[in-house]
Amino acid sequence: MARVTVEDCVDKVPNRFELVLLAGHRARAMSAGAELTVDRDNDKNPVVALREIADRTIMPEDLREELIGSMQSRVETEEPEVEQMQLLMSGEAAGEVKDTFGAAEGGGERMSEEDLLRAIQSQIDSPQQKSADADDMDGED
């Protein structure tokens, strides 16, 4: 029965290897509780997945996007600007922030917006670095 189903699907997904990937992904989704779009007829999940693809009740393009999304392990984040990164990597930024805080608390010079943003960023980055170091220690056994 599965051979006939595979033959029915080849015109919807021309590459048999991709067809197997998509049907396998759909079968795992069914096992996890996804709703069926065709009658089960006492068939196993991979056969039902192939029948769904053959009947076009599930679109291969949608399955492909779901499969790609499930395989991605992390989301790309924006890279910090090179200039800011260089400031953070050098010891100058930390010294400037301390001087600026001291001046602001003493009632002397006012802190510029740029200095305030650097100070906030250094405060944000510091706890993240400590928690990342703690995570690295937990992972080592």
Swiss-Prot record:
- Its GO CC terms? DNA-directed RNA polymerase complex
What Pfam family is a match, any one? Answer: RNA_pol_Rpb6
Q: Where is the composition biased (Polar residues)?
A: 121-131
BP-aspect Gene Ontology terms: DNA-templated transcription
Task: List the InterPro entries.
Answer: DNA-dir_RNA_pol_omega, Pol_omega/Rpo6/RPB6, RPB6/omega-like_sf
**EC number(s) per entry:** 2.7.7.6
Q: Which UniProt keywords apply?
A: DNA-directed RNA polymerase, Nucleotidyltransferase, Transcription, Transferase
**Catalysed reactions, as listed in the record:** RNA(n) + a ribonucleoside 5'-triphosphate = RNA(n+1) + diphosphate
Molecular functions per Gene Ontology = DNA binding; DNA-directed RNA polymerase activity
Stretches for region Disordered = 121-141
Q: Which domain of life is it from?
A: Bacteria
Q: What family does this belong to?
A: Belongs to the RNA polymerase subunit omega family.
Cite the HAMAP family for this sequence.
Answer: RNApol_bact_RpoZ
Instruction: Outline the subunit composition.
Output: The RNAP catalytic core consists of 2 alpha, 1 beta, 1 beta' and 1 omega subunit. When a sigma factor is associated with the core the holoenzyme is formed, which can initiate transcription.
> What the protein does?
Promotes RNA polymerase assembly. Latches the N- and C-terminal regions of the beta' subunit thereby facilitating its interaction with the beta and alpha subunits.
Instruction: Report what the protein is called.
Output: DNA-directed RNA polymerase subunit omega
* Organism of derivation: Parvibaculum lavamentivorans (strain DS-1 / DSM 13023 / NCIMB 13966)
Lineage, uppermost ranks: Bacteria, Pseudomonadati, Pseudomonadota, Alphaproteobacteria, Hyphomicrobiales
